[in-house]
Amino acid sequence: MFSVGKKISFILPIKGVLQKLKDNAQKTVLLDATWYLPTDTKNGKKEYLESRLPGAQYFDIDEAKDHKNPLPHMLPPADEFASYVGKLGIDRNTNVIIYDRKGFFSSPRVFWTFKVFGHEHVFLFPNAFNAWKTEGLELETGEPRTPKPVVYEGAKLNKDLVASFDDIVKVIESPDAAGVHIVDARAHERFLGNVPESRPGLASGHIPTSINIPFTETTAAGITAPKPEEDLEKVFSSHGLTDKSVPIITSCGSGVTASVLFAALKECGFKDVRVYDESWSGYGKRANEDSSLLATGP
């Protein structure tokens, strides 16, 4: 759990990753969290099976999800999360280091998931593949290693990190009283409602009162890593986010790039940040049926 008012260093460079592996390899697990948008022809699991950081396990957000919910990769129940990560050899005290092949795209979603369920020792390793190769280190190929299953105890959903549709409605109905910023991580044209959504049955536009900070404004070119903290501060400040005590809810298409903003905001010391789990995949359907929920244009 994030400590209130305390800056958490959870983004690791290659040297930090290697040090953790050196200090406590038996209690450190690398997780490949590679995932691509449905419109992409690539497959994260297939790429993992072809090559990976040595010893890495694969975290599939389309497997570790709420299977009773038709929306994409919604958070799983706590007991199912515990069962899933236990099979990956992860217990409550494991150092979990998460990366994705793109660099800093889907790994923050898995980072946020671990935080939601109260895992303390979880880190992000941006630009992992390039950093690994630059150090002259080899990737692992062939059959992935099979971890020894363990029991993950004490998983409990932290509601302070998750926003629901009801939370969104409260902000829409009384933004000043709610005192919450809703930040949309989608591309600007989607936010404006100028282009159709790729998923069927979704309205085009945005949540009333929300502001748009495309997640790519917070990442380096190619979405390989987060921008330096100083640059992130400038991005958020330019959009009016200067008071780090004001609550923020991040949203996107299905909760993935909203988690990129979550990580960037936490890196800058924002204290109260939640991810709207269903994001536009759920909200857009509701807005299709109730136009009062929809805003378009700037």
UniProtKB/Swiss-Prot annotation:
GO terms for biological process: mitochondrial tRNA wobble position uridine thiolation. Residues 142-175 are annotated as: Hinge. Substrate binds at residue 190. Its EC number is 2.8.1.2. The modification Phosphoserine is found at residue 164. One of its GO terms (molecular function) is 3-mercaptopyruvate sulfurtransferase activity. It catalyses: 2-oxo-3-sulfanylpropanoate + [thioredoxin]-dithiol = [thioredoxin]-disulfide + hydrogen sulfide + pyruvate + H(+). GO terms for cellular component: mitochondrion. InterPro entries: Rhodanese-like_dom (IPR001763), Rhodanese-like_dom_sf (IPR036873), TST/MPST-like (IPR045078). It is found in: Mitochondrion. The active site is at residue 252. Its main location: mitochondrion. It holds the Pfam family Rhodanese. Residues 24-141, 176-292 form the Rhodanese domain. Keywords: Mitochondrion, Phosphoprotein, Repeat, Transferase. Required for formation of the 2-thio group of the 5-methoxycarbonylmethyl-2-thiouridine modified base in some tRNAs. Contains two rhodanese domains with different primary structures but with near identical secondary structure conformations suggesting a common evolutionary origin. Only the C-terminal rhodanese domain contains the catalytic cysteine residue. This is Probable 3-mercaptopyruvate sulfurtransferase. It comes from Schizosaccharomyces pombe (strain 972 / ATCC 24843) (Fission yeast). The lineage of its organism: Eukaryota, Fungi, Dikarya, Ascomycota, Taphrinomycotina.
